[in-house]
Structures are given as structure tokens and as C-alpha cells.
Amino acid sequence: MVDCQKEACNLQSCIQRNQYNQGNCEKFVNDLLLCCKRWYDKNSLTGNEAPHTCPELKPLLRQLSSRNLT
């Protein structure tokens, strides 16, 4: 499976189950953000394009910081 696609699908399923209330799915948001961070940590120097499921690095780092996940 494509990098972080599992986490993105889990988040989407949770949001749909909860009538699009993301507040009930924070664990899945965090899982996706942490997966994306791991991807950047592993691939940032390779020149690979980030997975379409992940934000760009700077916004990702801001989101991680605001959630105290750094």
C-alpha cells in the first residue's frame, strides 16, 4: 500500500462514521500526521515526491507542533 494511505483511509472511515465530525477522530488524524513525519524523515533527502495523503513538510511540522506531537 502507498505510504500513509492506510492511515488516511482509517481517518476517512472514522470521519464518515461520525457524520464528518473530525473531533471524534483525533487519534486517526495524529496517526496520519505521524506517518507523514516518518515518511519525510526517511525520504527527505532522496528527492522522492511526498505521498498525496500527506501535507507539505512545513505545514506538517506546524500541525505536529500544535498537537504536541514533536
Curated annotation (Swiss-Prot):
Record-annotated disulphide pairs: C4-C35, C14-C25
UniProt keyword list: Disulfide bond, Mitochondrion, Repeat
Keyword Hydrolase: no
Induction description: Differentially expressed during meiosis.
UniProt short sequence motif Cx9C motif 2, positions renumbered to this chain: 25-35
Record's subcellular location: Mitochondrion intermembrane space
SUPFAM superfamilies cross-referenced by the UniProt entry: Cysteine alpha-hairpin motif
Sequence motif Cx9C motif 1, location on chain: 4-14
Segments forming domain CHCH: 1-43
InterPro entries according to UniProt: CMC4 (IPR027179), Cys_alpha_HP_mot_SF (IPR009069)
Keyword Lyase: no
CC terms in the record's Gene Ontology section: mitochondrial intermembrane space
Domain notes from UniProt: The twin Cx9C motifs are involved in the recognition by the mitochondrial mia40-erv1 disulfide relay system and the subsequent transfer of disulfide bonds by dithiol/disulfide exchange reactions to the newly imported protein.
Similarity-based family: Belongs to the CMC4 family.
Name this polypeptide is given: Cx9C motif-containing protein 4, mitochondrial
Organism: Schizosaccharomyces pombe (strain 972 / ATCC 24843)
